[in-house]
């Protein structure tokens, strides 16, 4: 195949939902996008606990346990998480994929994951990630945020790859992004 063999771990980064869409302690309900339920995302618990996920995988599976053999990627909110996790733990992942999303910091949060956004980004890029890949559709509702993030990277001379496709925040785009990203890993 085009991509190297790899272990893929898919976490539930949707911190205010206990399970897959439609499954929760509340019974079979549609996922909520209520701001009061999303508020806990700003506490950074998911990002702060991420090393535990890495430790679990490395303890239970045959892995190459080092930065050059780890990647993190996500779509939509997962892109937000991947951006923040990779900059908060700059020695953990050498490959970063942001599909339809990014982050530009959160001035209101006191969580260490979100504070000093630009300083942490500077540290991450000083360590020269092997690949920092960003992709977004032209009509995606997060397009402006991604453009702002890319401007920040450009203004600081940070190296990244960018792929722009048509359409918006849809699975068709995310499949394209993964198809482009995966073969670039671990080279």
Q: Language-model segments: what does each one mean?
A:
Residues 1-187:
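Non-catalytic cap/lid and distal C-terminal segments of serine-dependent acyl enzymes
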């Amino acid at each position: 195949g085009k991509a190297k063999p790899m272990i893929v771990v898919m976490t539930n980064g949707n911190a205010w939902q206990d399970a897959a869409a439609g499954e929760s302690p509340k019974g079979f309900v549609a996922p909520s996008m209520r701001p009061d339920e999303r508020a806990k995302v700003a506490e950074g618990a998911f990002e702060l606990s991420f090393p535990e996920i890495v430790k679990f995988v490395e303890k239970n599976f045959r892995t190459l346990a080092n930065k050059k053999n780890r990647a993190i990627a996500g779509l939509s909110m997962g892109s937000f998480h991947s951006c923040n996790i990779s900059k908060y733990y700059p020695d953990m992942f050498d490959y970063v994929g942001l599909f339809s999303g990014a982050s530009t910091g959160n001035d209101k949060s006191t969580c260490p994951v979100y504070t000093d956004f630009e300083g942490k980004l500077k540290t991450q890029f000083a360590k020269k990630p092997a690949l920092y890949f960003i992709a977004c559709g032209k009509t995606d509702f997060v397009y402006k945020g991604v453009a702002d993030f890319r401007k920040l990277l450009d203004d600081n001379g940070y190296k990244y790859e960018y792929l722009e496709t048509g359409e918006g925040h849809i699975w068709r785009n995310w499949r394209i992004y993964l198809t482009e990203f995966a073969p670039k890993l671990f080279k």
